Amino acid sequence: MTDKENGETYLNKYFVPYLPLILLIIIAGVISYYRLLIQMDIGPISDTCDFLLNALYFSGQGVGYYDWTRPVFFPLLIAIVFKLGFVSATAAYVVDILIYIFGLIGFYLLLSLHFNKIESFFGGLLYATFPIIILLSGLGFSDFTCGAFVIWAFYFLVLAVKENSKFFILFFLFWTMAFLTRFNAALIIFPVVLYIFMNKQEIKNHKYIGWGILASFLLIIPVLWFYQIKFGNILFPFMDTFGATSRTFSPEYHPYNVDPLFYIKGFFSYTGFESFIITFLIIIGIAVYTIIRVKNQSDIRNKLLSIVSKEDMNLKFKLLIFAVLTLIFIVTFGQVHYMVSEVIFLAVGLVFFTLINELNIKNIDLHILVFSWFMAFFIFNSVYVIKSSRYFILMAPGVAYLLLLGLRTVFNELTVKLKKGNLIFPVFALILTVFILLSTASLLPSIEDRFQGIRVTNEKIAIASEWFINYEPDYKNKVIYSNLWPYLAWHLKTDVKIMFTFKNNQAYLGGVKDNTTFTQQDNLASNNYLVDNNADYYFSSDAINLTSYKPIKQFGSVIIYERI
């Protein structure tokens, strides 16, 4: 064999099979690079500052301010970069982006368990270019890190069930890392239980489930010990997080939204026009396919009669239970605690699988797993009264998978009898890929405009901090309060206390929807709170009348008050 033939064999064996994945990584890498440059100009957001300050502590450079109600895993990853000497907000952006791309690789591999390489590439690109993904990637939030670990956890779960039970160890480790990144990752217990039930006969060696659980405990024990030291209660952060889901919030609180259809209404703004096109084609395809099938009335009639006329009472009972549970889920959705809805939907999934399993649909268990994954987070975030577009991030992989599945199924059914029908989907995917890339190119320049307020806030706080350090050289020994506390603590590198927003005899953490109409009683409540806590200085984004404090400097909307 010649050197040329050896080279071609090497390329065909080791390079060509991975070309779609490599291309996907390159595209995502280029998009992420430009997104990083934009974020470096915008600066950190409030939550990012919390992660950065926690990371300073873990790197041995703590400044006195921490928020230990936030899970520790993401700050620990940032702390590794800090230990290498790169102490900057950019560290959080880079870690966020790198793990997001790591998650994208896992998503491609998960897709490849059912789809071919071209389809998996397209599904990965679809997920990577959802407007909500591009908009929020690189912010230095923990959502993408959690999402990446969840993706890999599900990938290893499928491998553990279908190929080698040893993968259960990796499944539990990634699930634990996801949980320690965002506590609501615990919700994947529902799709996991459903998937294991669907494949209970296929698990070859149950002992590796035990080994996986043990590995998870070894990973989580240091964190529990840390919480014991900080709070005197190893469960406090978990209780605080999940307790908030049952807490009553005032409608004045700015993220408050009781609409259970919040994420459905914003669906196409999160997923982009390309998802609208795909959804439209899926609906049209189903309609056309139904019309074609209905023409063959005898075929339809025979199938219906074969189901209805069966003397299988067990089947009829399952159909009845499925219908009742589905109706209960729909009627009670948004009216009961999210955990009730999660359990009802799990029951719906279990009954549905027992009904459809006899049809021998290829990888139906995988499709149900992904759908239940999406629903686990959709139910929780829709019922929880505190809503944010960023919470859609953990639903996005499931959406991309289901859109790809629907599109591929429709194309297969409608083109199966066409000559060269197998080329129609790749051609369509290529056209839509070009459209997606053009849309992404037009979206990137607009991101900075969307975060203009954050950029200005960072600029003003940086200037105010520099001025204040010169004005009060002993500032680290002063008691400082602010309603912009994470920003200020990061810029001053010192402890800054949380200042609540007082309105209508209530205290709000993080502001209110209407911050323009404060009464004298509201101002008095703010003043008394500062006095009672011996505040020397107060940095505020709101102009308020404080009887015990005077404004000494203003930078844009940032006002510095000093105690009289």
Regions from the language model: what does each represent?
Residues 3-6, 159-164, 175, 188-220, ...:
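Perimembrane helix-loop-helix junctions
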Residues 21, 173, 217, 314-326, ...:
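Signature aromatic-anchored transmembrane alpha helix within multi-pass, membrane-resident enzymes
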Residues 31, 50, 207-289, 296, ...:
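Membrane-lumen/periplasm interface segments of specific transmembrane helices
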Residues 46, 70, 132, 138-146, ...:
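Short acidic/glycine- and proline-prone juxtamembrane loop motifs at membrane-interface regions
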Residues 56, 143, 178, 187, ...:
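Hydrophobic/aromatic-rich transmembrane helices and adjacent perimembrane loops
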Residues 112-118, 153-168, 178, 359-360, ...:
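Membrane-interface transmembrane helices that cradle and orient dolichyl/undecaprenyl
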Residues 426-488:
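Membrane-embedded, lumen/periplasm-facing catalytic core of multi-pass transferases
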Residues 469-507, 535-541:
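Short periplasmic/luminal acceptor-recognition loop of GT-C membrane glycosyltransferases, typified by
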